[in-house]
Amino acid sequence: MQSMELKKLLSYTRQAVDDYKLIEEGDHIAVGISGGKDSLTLLYALAGLRRFYPKKFTLTAITVDLGYDSFDLTPIKQLCEELKVPYHIVKTEIARILFHGDRVSDKAVKGSPCALCAKMRKGALNEAALELGCNKVAYAHHMDDVIETAFLSMIFEGRFYAFPPSTHL
């Protein structure tokens, strides 16, 4: 990453952390890693912030493996080693539970399979974070995710809901 881009990323990260009081002294933060650009950028930003932020905190990266065979985690492992962040993989059978071959399971048919998968992933991640001694979990949600969540909530749940900047673990 270019130096100017990195400074801008760290500046935005610090601003959000300060504005919403997301990090306290001694926090052990689990970072949910999907392998996508958003979660990897969050990990990179928090690892950079950790070097100079006045409140000391530690990070642990966690990926919830849904059980797909072709999910290569090698690049994530390498990045975590470079950033000196412990990395844990939570093996699950979420894909098998939601899908039977090409057919969506009865559990997922009652609602959106995406919503059920998200809830199951979040539960697995939160459980792992607690087991690893983390007191907070960082998700790489951004404004597009807030808007999407609000619309999906209205469509599938009949209510207007969007997640807050922080919730308790």
Where do the PLM segments sit?
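ATP-dependent adenylation/nucleotidyltransferase module used to activate substrates
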Residues: 1-165
